[in-house]
């Protein structure tokens, strides 16, 4: 049995992780969960999975969960805020942490988990985007395994199994193209929030859905792949694959290409990360190749979707430039979801921040500098946002 903590248990990835645990026939046990403020969902988790630890992000929801546990005689340790995240990520009782919180808040608990020598099922992109060098070094020093939960990185991870990574020539990251694939820049001027949230293939949270619409999600995945697989940016290629059946590919020095195919179901990469090397259980539908009419591949339109190109530039610049990229994107996406800026302004804001903060990008790469600059960039975006 493997004991698990989930950071962000009520979100899209967290909920699907719970389903993997539910269907694991006792191979996985939930020990700790954290959530933002979703009291009702956490109570449902408590009743079904009986975790020993629960963390909520604010005082009100923490009080409500404590009150519920007292009234129903639940012997659960209820924790609050970032301290609760850190504690639940590094419990003595657990073997692995699923980091499915969204945004920069995932960085600190991920580092705490690594320091406590807990393996990581990583669904929080921002951790590697802003601090990949620090995180991967710490993981190596603490003999911690990092299992990617993103479908693309899980695919690459699987394609590399049994092969010498030194013979890797190129990583080919596939992208669905998002809901606006094939659209012109002019046609995206007045995109509504509701339209941007309608991903054609995947069921995802709000922030990642907007990132997919701008192609920033793929840009963040490029930086993530660079750190996970120690691959130069010039050897990472993004290919638009609208059917989302080929989840990613790797090309070796001999010219052969290995691809991973599967259903559009995030439970597949989650299960692979949690039950590594155990492929006995089928949790998702299989592909019927007689039903697939075609698999197509296209070049991404980086003129219309410039966020992808900005991510490549930030990754190549290194140091703190990915922090600027990520912070500006997080703040801009939030403003768009709140209907305070237009869709195309997201990438414009990111580009402007990369220019405004470029001198600070060369500071030493430390967790303190990352957190400080992230805050500064977000404050700048909020202060200067104009619809």
Swiss-Prot record:
Gene3D superfamilies, from UniProt? 1.10.1740.10, NAD(P)-binding Rossmann-like Domain
InterPro entries listed in its UniProt record: DXP_reductoisomerase, DXP_reductoisomerase_C, DXP_reductoisomerase_N, DXPR_C, DXPR_C_sf, NAD(P)-bd_dom_sf
What keywords appear on the UniProt entry? Isoprene biosynthesis, Manganese, Metal-binding, NADP, Oxidoreductase
Gene Ontology molecular function terms on file: 1-deoxy-D-xylulose-5-phosphate reductoisomerase activity; manganese ion binding; NADPH binding
* Manganese listed as a keyword: yes
All disulfide bonds of the chain are none
* Amino-acid positions noted as binding NADPH in the UniProt annotation, renumbered to this chain: 10-13, 124, 126, 205
Q: Where does 1-deoxy-D-xylulose 5-phosphate bind?
A: 125, 151-152, 176, 199, 212, 217-218, 221
* Chain sites annotated for binding Mn(2+): 150, 152, 221
Which cofactors are reported in the record for this sequence?
A: Mg(2+); Mn(2+)
Q: Which pathway features in its UniProt record?
A: Isoprenoid biosynthesis; isopentenyl diphosphate biosynthesis via DXP pathway; isopentenyl diphosphate from 1-deoxy-D-xylulose 5-phosphate: step 1/6
Q: What is its EC number?
A: 1.1.1.267
Which example biological process does GO assign this protein? isopentenyl diphosphate biosynthetic process, methylerythritol 4-phosphate pathway involved in terpenoid biosynthetic process
Catalytic activity, reaction form: 2-C-methyl-D-erythritol 4-phosphate + NADP(+) = 1-deoxy-D-xylulose 5-phosphate + NADPH + H(+)
Pfam families, A to Z? DXP_redisom_C, DXP_reductoisom, DXPR_C
Keyword Ubl conjugation present in the record's keywords: the answer is: no
Q: Give the EC class as a word.
A: oxidoreductase
Q: Which domain of life is it from?
A: Bacteria
Q: Sorted alphabetically, which PANTHER family does this protein's record hold?
A: 1-DEOXY-D-XYLULOSE 5-PHOSPHATE REDUCTOISOMERASE, 1-DEOXY-D-XYLULOSE 5-PHOSPHATE REDUCTOISOMERASE, CHLOROPLASTIC
**UniProt similarity note:** Belongs to the DXR family.
What job does this protein perform? Answer: Catalyzes the NADPH-dependent rearrangement and reduction of 1-deoxy-D-xylulose-5-phosphate (DXP) to 2-C-methyl-D-erythritol 4-phosphate (MEP).
Protein name, as recorded: 1-deoxy-D-xylulose 5-phosphate reductoisomerase
Taxonomic source organism: Clostridium beijerinckii (strain ATCC 51743 / NCIMB 8052) (Clostridium acetobutylicum)
- Gene name tied to this protein: dxr
């Amino acid at each position: 049995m493997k004991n698990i903590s989930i950071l962000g248990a009520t979100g899209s990835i967290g909920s699907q992780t719970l389903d993997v645990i539910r269907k694991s026939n006792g191979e996985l046990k939930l020990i700790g969960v954290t959530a933002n403020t979703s009291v009702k969902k956490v109570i449902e988790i408590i009743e079904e999975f009986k975790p020993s630890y629960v963390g909520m992000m604010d005082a009100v929801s923490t009080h409500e969960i404590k009150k519920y546990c007292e009234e129903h005689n639940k012997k659960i340790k209820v924790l609050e805020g970032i301290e609760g995240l850190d504690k639940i990520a590094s419990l003595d009782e657990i073997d692995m942490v699923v980091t499915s919180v969204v945004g920069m808040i995932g960085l600190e608990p991920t580092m705490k988990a690594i320091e406590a020598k807990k393996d990581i099922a990583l669904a929080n992109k921002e951790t590697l985007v802003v601090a990949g060098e620090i995180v991967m070094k710490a993981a190596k020093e603490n003999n911690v395994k990092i299992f990617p939960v993103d479908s693309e990185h899980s695919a690459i991870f699987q394609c590399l199994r049994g092969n010498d990574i030194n013979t890797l020539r190129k990583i080919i990251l596939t992208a669905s193209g998002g809901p606006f694939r094939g659209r012109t820049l002019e046609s995206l001027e007045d995109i509504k929030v509701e339209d941007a949230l309608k991903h054609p293939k995947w069921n995802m949270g709000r922030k990642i859905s907007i990132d997919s619409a701008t192609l920033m999600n793929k840009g963040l995945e490029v930086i993530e792949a660079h750190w996970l697989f120690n691959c130069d940016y010039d050897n990472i290629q993004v290919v638009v694959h609208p059917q989302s059946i080929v989840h990613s590919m790797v090309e070796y020095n001999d010219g052969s290409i290995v691809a991973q195919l599967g259903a559009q179901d995030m439970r597949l990469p989650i299960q692979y990360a949690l039950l590594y090397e155990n492929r006995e259980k089928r949790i998702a539908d299989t592909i019927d190749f007689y039903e697939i009419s075609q698999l197509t591949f296209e070049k991404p339109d980086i003129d219309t979707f410039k966020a992808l190109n900005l991510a490549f530039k930030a990754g190549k610049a290194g140091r703190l430039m990915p922090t600027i990229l990520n912070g500006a994107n997080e703040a801009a996406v939030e403003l768009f979801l709140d209907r305070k800026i237009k869709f195309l302004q997201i990438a414009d804001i990111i580009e402007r921040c990369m220019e405004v903060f470029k001198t600070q990008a060369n500071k030493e790469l430390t967790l303190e500098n990352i957190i400080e600059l992230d805050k500064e960039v977000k404050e700048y975006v909020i202060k200067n946002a104009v619809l």
